[in-house]
Regions:
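Short acidic/polar inter-strand loop motif in beta-rich domains
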Residues: 414-426
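Extracellular acidic, Ser/Thr/Pro-rich low-complexity tracts
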Residues: 319-321, 364-366, 420
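Compositionally biased low-complexity segments at domain edges in trafficked proteins
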Residues: 1-15, 19, 439-463
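Hydrophobic helix-coil surface modules that form long, contiguous segments used
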Residues: 2-169, 198, 210
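Short beta-strand elements
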Residues: 423-442
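Hydrophobic alpha-helical and helix-loop surface patches within well-folded domains
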Residues: 74, 103-360
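Beta-strand-rich binding/interaction modules
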Residues: 27-28, 339-414
Length: 463
């Protein structure tokens, strides 16, 4: 027995018959093939105000005889787990994405937070996953309420403790990564947690901007002074979290089995945060969202409804892209090597043909290797972008190139997509930001110097 780690099982078909009190409403993996789960009797009319509907519902609802029973049969085909949940207090809403039924069951007491919102978010989540990774192979997916906070995933069913959009997208991601692509969560926790963490971040940043959440629905950011706070990139926050561990001297390999991590923090960073950042770097390496997601679709199509592991994932990436990627994955997964590039020199000379020659000194202060996007800002207002690819096994190099206009500044990895331990030496001109030092303000972007100011008042005691 290992306390850390979750599931691993064989694919099969589950035909499960329930005999429960008629007062209970039930949801489960699979589809109803016989009996009444009780949904129709508690379906919310979302065309009217929720509280008005509850008032009407409570005045007209006829509770079942306490001694009566209901029999329901669920069939779940080609899954490696089965889960169910039942409650006397469930209400029900239903929607559809293409040919997929989307069910939502929630506690009446949380209805104001859940009604309509969770169904909309659930439909958007499954639409996103189908678009980015591939067609969902099951006929339904169900989002249900749970007593505790947080979430838990099963094939075709997730149990969520709140209406959070990020939580819904994360748990639906698990239906793909764990459910459809079935990794051993004891040995390769990163293959599901890391994948759904990065796709959740990308979804939220795509929908709401780099800060990665809906500011209008966050009460904290509707009040003064926090409504005026600058918002930090969600990616930067994850990078800082990983960097703190890397600098601590207590970092561990991502590939380590879950039960061997020294503590919960090490497990969390190495199952969730670091592999998510690794996949962000893979997207950066491909220099194309379309190539990255095309490769992911290839992996998904090849291994859906089968068991996956590290080797099968890496092979799929290499097969599709026709690139050797072992150097990239090996350092991320099997070492604690870190990335730390810097600009060691920047020489610019106007040559005889009225162009500018640049010699950019690049130094690797770390122990991991990456190609680097080089961005040069020019006097004519344009920006030159190119790649330095002489990276493998090199700790220093001079990158020479020619420009039509005078270069003003240079940055390596200008969009801060890599987990470079010290970004300050990645640019010849770091941006400066001056902000008022509000109580409670946390703002620590990786690509800026932040200067905080606040008034201070003193007085002298009179004599």
């Amino acid at each position: 027995f290992h306390a850390e780690g979750e599931f691993y099982g064989e694919f099969g078909d589950f035909n499960v018959k329930f005999d429960i009190p008629s007062s209970f409403i039930i949801g489960a993996s699979g589809t109803v093939i016989d009996g009444d789960p009780g949904w129709n009797s508690v379906t919310v009319d979302t065309s009217i105000d929720f509280n008005k509907w509850v008032e009407n519902f409570e005045s007209t609802y006829i509770a079942p005889d306490p001694s009566s029973r209901r029999n329901i049969t669920f069939l779940a085909e080609n899954v490696h787990d089965f889960a169910w949940v039942a409650s006397k207090d469930f209400l029900y809403e239903k929607g559809k994405h293409n040919d997929i039924d989307v069910h939502v069951l929630y506690d009446k007491g949380r209805g104001e937070d859940w009604t309509k919102v969770v169904l909309d978010r659930s439909i958007r989540a499954i639409a996103w996953l189908e678009d980015k990774f591939g067609k969902y192979p099951y006929p339904q997916i169900t989002t249900t309420d749970r007593v505790k906070n947080g979430g838990m995933e099963y094939p075709m069913l997730v149990m969520n403790g709140r209406a959070s959009e990020g939580l819904i997208v994360h748990e639906y991601g698990h239906v793909y990564f764990y459910g459809i692509l079935a990794n051993n969560e004891l040995d390769d926790a990163w293959l599901d947690e890391g994948f759904t963490t990065t796709q959740t971040s990308h979804y939220l940043m795509t929908r709401y901007g780099d800060h990665g959440f809906d500011k209008s629905e966050n009460d904290y950011y509707q009040k003064f002074p926090s409504k005026n706070f600058p918002l930090e990139s969600d990616l930067h926050q994850d990078q800082w979290s990983a960097i703190r561990l890397m600098r601590s001297g207590h970092d561990e390999n991502i590939s380590r089995p879950s039960y061997l991590f020294k503590n919960g923090t090490a497990y969390s960073r190495n199952a969730y945060t670091k592999p998510s950042l690794m996949l962000t770097e893979l997207r950066y390496l491909f220099d194309s969202d379309s190539l990255y997601y095309a490769a992911m679709k290839y992996y998904y199509q090849k291994w859906k409804l089968k068991h996956v592991n590290e080797e099968r994932f890496i092979d799929a990436m290499e097969e599709f892209t026709q690139q050797d990627l072992n150097w990239f994955f090996d350092s991320w997964l099997h070492t604690t090597n870190h990335l730390d590039y810097g600009i060691s020199s920047f020489k610019k000379i106007k040559n005889n043909n009225n162009k500018w020659s640049v010699d950019l000194g690049i130094k690797n202060y770390g122990s991991r290797f990456m190609p680097l996007k080089i961005e040069t800002k020019l006097a004519d207002g344009s920006i030159d972008v190119r790649w330095w690819e002489n990276h493998k096994w090199r700790f220093s190099d001079t990158f020479s190139y020619e420009l039509d206009s005078k270069p003003l500044s240079v940055a390596i990895d200008p969009d801060v997509q890599t987990v470079d331990l010290d970004y300050r030496n990645n640019t010849t001109k770091m941006r400066n930001t001056i902000i008022f030092d509000w109580p409670g303000l946390y703002y620590n972007p990786r690509d800026q110097y932040v200067y905080r100011w606040s008034p201070q008042f003193y007085y002298n005691e009179s004599k």
